[in-house]
Amino acid sequence: MPKLEMMLLVLLILPLSYFSAAGGQVVQGDWRGDGLARYLQRGDRDAQGCQVVTPGSKWGRCCLNRVCGPMCCPASHCYCIYHRGRGHGCSC
Protein backbone atom coordinates (compact mmCIF):
# COMPACT_ATOMS: atom_id res chain seq x y z
CA MET A 1 0.00 0.00 0.00
CA PRO A 2 1.53 3.36 -0.99
CA LYS A 3 2.37 5.88 1.70
CA LEU A 4 -0.33 8.34 0.62
CA GLU A 5 -3.08 5.72 0.86
CA MET A 6 -1.79 4.62 4.26
CA MET A 7 -1.76 8.21 5.52
CA LEU A 8 -5.32 8.80 4.30
CA LEU A 9 -6.47 5.61 5.98
CA VAL A 10 -4.90 6.68 9.28
CA LEU A 11 -6.51 10.12 9.03
CA LEU A 12 -9.92 8.57 8.42
CA ILE A 13 -9.58 6.27 11.42
CA LEU A 14 -8.32 9.03 13.72
CA PRO A 15 -11.29 10.30 15.75
CA LEU A 16 -12.14 13.86 14.83
CA SER A 17 -13.59 14.58 18.27
CA TYR A 18 -10.07 14.94 19.66
CA PHE A 19 -9.43 18.07 17.63
CA SER A 20 -11.10 21.46 17.59
CA ALA A 21 -11.95 23.43 14.45
CA ALA A 22 -8.71 25.40 14.86
CA GLY A 23 -6.67 22.20 14.84
CA GLY A 24 -5.80 22.15 18.55
CA GLN A 25 -6.62 19.42 20.99
CA VAL A 26 -9.99 19.68 22.68
CA VAL A 27 -10.30 19.46 26.47
CA GLN A 28 -11.33 15.89 27.16
CA GLY A 29 -14.45 14.97 29.08
CA ASP A 30 -17.86 13.50 28.54
CA TRP A 31 -20.31 15.51 26.49
CA ARG A 32 -22.89 15.40 29.30
CA GLY A 33 -20.51 17.02 31.79
CA ASP A 34 -20.28 20.62 32.86
CA GLY A 35 -19.75 22.72 29.74
CA LEU A 36 -18.61 25.84 31.57
CA ALA A 37 -15.81 23.96 33.32
CA ARG A 38 -14.54 22.74 29.95
CA TYR A 39 -14.86 26.28 28.55
CA LEU A 40 -12.83 27.70 31.42
CA GLN A 41 -10.05 25.13 30.96
CA ARG A 42 -9.30 26.50 27.49
CA GLY A 43 -6.84 29.36 27.15
CA ASP A 44 -6.55 31.91 29.95
CA ARG A 45 -10.12 31.56 31.23
CA ASP A 46 -9.23 29.97 34.56
CA ALA A 47 -11.80 30.07 37.34
CA GLN A 48 -11.04 32.36 40.26
CA GLY A 49 -11.68 31.30 43.82
CA CYS A 50 -14.57 32.70 45.83
CA GLN A 51 -14.01 36.00 47.59
CA VAL A 52 -15.49 36.34 51.08
CA VAL A 53 -18.02 39.17 51.10
CA THR A 54 -18.67 39.52 54.84
CA PRO A 55 -15.77 39.21 57.32
CA GLY A 56 -16.25 36.11 59.50
CA SER A 57 -18.66 34.54 57.03
CA LYS A 58 -18.08 31.23 55.25
CA TRP A 59 -20.04 32.41 52.25
CA GLY A 60 -18.44 34.29 49.43
CA ARG A 61 -19.19 35.70 46.04
CA CYS A 62 -17.83 33.58 43.24
CA CYS A 63 -16.75 35.61 40.21
CA LEU A 64 -15.51 33.64 37.23
CA ASN A 65 -15.69 36.09 34.35
CA ARG A 66 -18.36 37.66 32.17
CA VAL A 67 -19.77 34.20 31.38
CA CYS A 68 -20.78 33.44 34.98
CA GLY A 69 -22.41 36.04 37.19
CA PRO A 70 -21.87 36.46 40.95
CA MET A 71 -23.15 33.71 43.23
CA CYS A 72 -22.59 32.37 46.74
CA CYS A 73 -20.48 29.37 47.74
CA PRO A 74 -20.19 27.60 51.12
CA ALA A 75 -16.43 28.10 51.55
CA SER A 76 -13.65 30.34 50.28
CA HIS A 77 -11.90 27.48 48.43
CA CYS A 78 -14.96 26.76 46.25
CA TYR A 79 -15.37 27.82 42.65
CA CYS A 80 -18.31 28.24 40.28
CA ILE A 81 -19.16 25.55 37.76
CA TYR A 82 -22.03 24.95 35.36
CA HIS A 83 -23.81 21.59 35.27
CA ARG A 84 -25.91 20.96 32.20
CA GLY A 85 -29.50 20.53 33.30
CA ARG A 86 -28.77 21.74 36.84
CA GLY A 87 -27.43 25.24 36.18
CA HIS A 88 -24.69 27.11 38.04
CA GLY A 89 -23.28 25.73 41.26
CA CYS A 90 -20.20 25.58 43.47
CA SER A 91 -17.54 22.92 43.50
CA CYS A 92 -15.63 22.56 46.77
From Swiss-Prot:
Q: Does the keyword Lipid biosynthesis apply?
A: no
- Report the principal subcellular site: secreted
Q: Where is the signal peptide?
A: 1-24
Q: Which residues carry this modification: 4-hydroxyproline?
A: 55
Q: Listed disulfide bonds for this chain?
A: 63-72, 68-80, 73-90, 78-92
Propeptide positions: the record gives: 25-45
Subcellular location as annotated: Secreted
Please provide the record's keywords in A-Z order.
Answer: Acetylcholine receptor inhibiting toxin, Disulfide bond, Hydroxylation, Ion channel impairing toxin, Neurotoxin, Postsynaptic neurotoxin, Secreted, Signal, Toxin
List the record's Gene Ontology CC terms alphabetically.
extracellular region; host cell postsynaptic membrane
The answer to keyword Metal-binding applying to this record is no
Subunit (UniProt): Hetero-, homo- or pseudo-homodimer (identical sequence, different post-translational modifications).
Per the record, the similarity remark reads: Belongs to the conotoxin D superfamily.
Record's protein name: Alpha-conotoxin-like Mi20.3
The upper taxonomy is: Eukaryota, Metazoa, Spiralia, Lophotrochozoa, Mollusca
